[in-house]
């Protein structure tokens, strides 16, 4: 029995952690953003460690309510910083969403093949996928006219995301065991149902591992690229603040 439960835990962990991976990948970086960012067509507003900065698309700067007189170099710094924020934050959000959906689709195919199209595990993974996307939207909140990045939400979202995965795991494990048991019972094959179920679990686990191997490099590259962009944005922020004095 202990051996069976360890195998089930391994299967469930593989399924769920693969799904959750890219929701967290973009935030696993030594550099932590220090500001909220509000992007609209009129300006990029940065609030937090930077005080309150508003940068226009042309590089004009309002700092803590005061319009600053800028040198050409300062204006170019501000222009480049707000341009990078407008480009990189949507890119991060889109990339994370795409990879989360890609993992869901890939896992769904594995579940259909191994457990059948009527498996309730499919519903559980779809629900988990939607919940993780909702968590991500707490960090990068999209609006019709732009987006808002909430830097203080990062740690809480990581915590809540892990809890969602853990809460879903029990149901996935139970459904997998029940459905494989029913499959074995209806097939009428073999005299050792437990051994047959364990064999099926092994096949499911291997299929998931193969899918993870296919996607792992892309997920890791995305995480590294996000960290690089976040690091560059933080350097630009510090350099601009130093220049403004």
Q: Which ranges hold each PLM region?
A:
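Heptad-repeat coiled-coil alpha-helices
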Residues: 98, 105, 112, 141, ...
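Bacterial N-terminal signal peptides that target proteins for export
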Residues: 2-11
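Disulfide-bonded cysteine motifs in exported proteins
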Residues: 24-25, 222
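Extended amphipathic alpha-helical interaction segments
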Residues: 119-213
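Sec-dependent N-terminal signal peptides
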Residues: 10-18
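N-terminal Sec/ER secretory leader and immediately downstream segment
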Residues: 25-131
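A cross-kingdom marker for long, charged
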Residues: 195-245
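N-terminal signal peptide c-region/cleavage motif recognized by signal peptidases
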Residues: 20-22
């Amino acid at each position: 029995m202990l051996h069976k439960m360890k195998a089930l835990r391994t299967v469930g962990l593989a399924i769920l952690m693969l799904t959750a991976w890219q929701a967290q990948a973009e935030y696993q970086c030594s550099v932590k953003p220090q500001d909220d960012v509000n992007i609209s067509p009129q300006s990029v507003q940065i609030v937090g460690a930077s005080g309150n900065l508003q940068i226009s698309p042309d590089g004009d700067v309002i700092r803590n309510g005061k319009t600053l007189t800028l040198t050409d170099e300062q204006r170019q710094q501000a222009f480049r910083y707000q341009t990078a924020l407008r480009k990189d934050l949507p890119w991060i959000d889109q990339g994370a969403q795409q990879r989360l959906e890609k993992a869901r689709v890939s896992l769904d195919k594995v579940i259909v093949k191994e457990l059948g199209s009527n498996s309730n595990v499919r519903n559980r993974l779809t629900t988990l996928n939607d919940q993780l996307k909702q968590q991500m939207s707490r960090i990068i909140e999209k609006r019709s006219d732009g987006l808002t990045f909430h830097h203080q939400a990062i740690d809480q979202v990581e915590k809540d995301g892990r809890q969602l995965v853990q809460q879903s795991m029990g149901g996935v494990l139970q459904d997998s065991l029940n459905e494989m048991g029913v499959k074995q019972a209806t097939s009428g094959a073999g005299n050792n149902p437990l051994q047959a179920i364990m064999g099926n679990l092994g096949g499911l686990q291997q299929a998931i591992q193969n899918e993870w191997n296919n996607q792992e490099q892309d997920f890791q590259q995305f995480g590294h690229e996000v960290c690089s962009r976040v690091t560059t944005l933080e350097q630009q922020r510090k350099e601009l603040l130093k220049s403004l004095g």
